């Protein structure tokens, strides 16, 4: 909006997932950053709460009765990802928009061929909107094309209608994509650099990542909202109900593609070699609501002996693989969402006596596998369904509480500190020249406070990053000779040749001989200096 393009940490960026930042722009009309952040919290709550509307629309479109509709809406209300409303995470709008995306595709499935073209065009344009929020949302687009190919395979006479629908879907998406590339994002590359080829070591780790992520995804979705629709798939014969033939496959494909994308773009790159890779179920969580609806429809049917056997085989296979392949979940509990209950117990197994942590983790996984088998028996025999529905709601509440606890521990800022940081922002806005912020800690709470409450452009370079780069070998950061930048996004600034002001965190050993302490009030743990030698910053290091 300032005419400087997209920027992250005051450097040009190709990151184009701008939908969530646009959604919180109204809060910037307020004067202080403290007031703006409070307003963003209320906006987040409103966006998250709006997820009940597409959940209700989905339930009604699937012909659910009032009791089941209330159950699906109730699960939506207490989904763990709802806790993201207290953060700056884009899940705030990803959840409601994902549910609307599924709704549009469902209406396209149920529509007559001519009307389906319009629904597909709308779904394609909406998918681009969702793509502006998260690139992983493309799993909806890919899954839809695969489902239409499956429908065509079973009804060759419908090839023209299927071709027209896919053309409308992909065409509307591409029009939005190319229009944005030619205007708003002109000259920019890709948002992520995680699309490159893997190394040999990463290729070897990829099969484990795929299997492990898939097994945990099934567990996160309570197993049977995945396994029951899988064993209850029907061929899409002419005149068949798309809610029972096409929708289950569409959701399962979306889930599978999402898991594969996570394994390829995150697990093999950030958890390489780890026996307990982190789980990013927050990218998949919106699929739980429509999968629950499909599961309820599947349970209405009488499972044949063959399908019961398939379900038993799938349950046993999942249980054996889960016990044998998986171990635990790595650090990063805020991404686990629906797996908070698993992680809560797993994190405390090191406190148990007699057996080691590895053995107790194996016991915990075995208990879960047995519990899933018992759950399957109860579902197939149609026993205790109301109790199980209540248990699902309780489990969601517990996972929500776990997410809230983690977010509060990670992001909470005392009101007094927030006011001080907001006052610092006002003071910095009056200063002329460049401001260099040197936090102590790479991507830690030091930088979070300043980056959140200071709206002015500042240059960020962590003290640890300076040490590792060798820029402080002589104790002097010479900005005319050395190009430095923050740990993320991992590039050096091209326009940082002077630092008129230095904002240093406690622990950063700046040499104050050429610095003059400013009058601006700073939050505890920070000091603002006027740099008398703007081209150099000296440090008291040997």
Regions found by a protein language model. Name each.
Residues 3-25, 38:
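Membrane-proximal lumenal/periplasmic loop motifs of glycosylation machinery
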Residues 13, 83-94, 133-136:
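Short acidic/glycine- and proline-prone juxtamembrane loop motifs at membrane-interface regions
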Residues 42-63, 96, 100-104:
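Transmembrane-helix motifs of polytopic, lipid-linked glycan transferases
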Residues 215-252, 291-297, 368-381:
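Hydrophobic, aromatic-rich transmembrane alpha-helices
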Residues 409-418, 426-471, 501-507:
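Short periplasmic/luminal acceptor-recognition loop of GT-C membrane glycosyltransferases, typified by
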């Amino acid at each position: 909006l300032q005419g400087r393009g997209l920027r992250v940490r005051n450097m040009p960026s190709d990151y184009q997932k701008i939908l969530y930042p646009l959604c919180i722009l109204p809060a910037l009309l307020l004067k202080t950053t403290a007031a703006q952040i409070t307003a963003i919290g209320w906006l987040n709550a409103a966006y998250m709460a709006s997820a009940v509307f597409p959940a209700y629309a989905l339930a009604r479109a699937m012909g659910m009765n009032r009791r089941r509709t209330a159950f699906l809406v109730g699960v939506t209300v207490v989904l763990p990802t709802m806790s993201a409303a207290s953060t700056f995470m884009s899940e705030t709008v990803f959840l409601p928009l994902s549910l609307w995306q599924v709704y549009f595709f469902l209406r396209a499935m149920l529509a007559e061929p001519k009307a389906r073209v319009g629904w597909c065009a709308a779904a394609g344009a909406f998918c681009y909107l969702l793509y502006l929020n998260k690139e992983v949302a493309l799993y909806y687009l890919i899954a839809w094309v695969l489902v239409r190919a499956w429908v065509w395979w079973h009804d060759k006479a419908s090839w023209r209608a299927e071709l027209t629908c896919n053309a409308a879907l992909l065409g509307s998406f591409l029009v939005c994509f190319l229009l944005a590339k030619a205007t708003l994002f002109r000259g920019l590359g890709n948002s992520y650099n995680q699309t490159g080829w893997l190394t040999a070591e990463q290729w070897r780790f990829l099969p484990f990542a795929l299997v492990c992520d898939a097994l945990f995804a099934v567990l996160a979705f309570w197993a049977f909202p995945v396994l029951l629709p899988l064993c209850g798939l029907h061929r899409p014969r002419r005149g068949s109900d798309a809610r029972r033939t096409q929708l289950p496959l569409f959701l399962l494909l979306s889930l599978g593609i999402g898991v594969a994308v996570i394994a390829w773009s995150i697990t093999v790159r950030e958890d390489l070699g780890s026996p307990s890779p982190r789980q990013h179920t927050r990218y998949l969580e919106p699929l739980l609501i429509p999968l629950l609806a499909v599961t309820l429809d599947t349970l209405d049917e009488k499972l044949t002996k063959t399908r019961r056997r398939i379900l038993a085989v799938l349950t046993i296979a999942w249980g054996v693989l889960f016990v044998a392949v998986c171990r635990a979940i790595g650090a990063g509990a805020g991404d686990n969402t629906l797996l908070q209950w698993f992680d809560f117990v797993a994190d405390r197994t090191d406190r148990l006596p007699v057996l080691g942590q590895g053995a107790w983790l194996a016991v915990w996984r075995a208990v879960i596998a047995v519990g899933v088998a018992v759950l399957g028996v109860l579902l197939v025999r149609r026993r205790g369904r109301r109790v199980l529905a209540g248990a699902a709601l309780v489990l969601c509440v517990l996972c929500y509480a776990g997410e809230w606890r983690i977010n509060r521990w990670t992001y909470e800022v005392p009101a007094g500190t927030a006011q001080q940081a907001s006052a610092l922002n006002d003071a910095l806005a009056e200063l002329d020249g460049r401001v260099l912020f040197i936090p102590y800690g790479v991507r830690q709470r030091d930088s979070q406070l300043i980056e959140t409450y200071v709206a002015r452009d500042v240059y960020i370079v962590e003290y640890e990053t300076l040490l590792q780069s060798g820029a402080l070998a002589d104790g002097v950061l010479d900005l005319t000779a050395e190009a430095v930048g923050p740990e993320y996004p991992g590039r050096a600034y091209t326009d940082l040749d002077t630092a008129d002001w230095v904002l240093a965190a406690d622990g950063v050993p700046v040499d104050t001989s050429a610095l003059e302490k400013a009058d601006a009030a700073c939050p505890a743990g920070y000091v603002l200096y006027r740099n008398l030698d703007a081209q150099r910053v000296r440090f008291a290091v040997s």
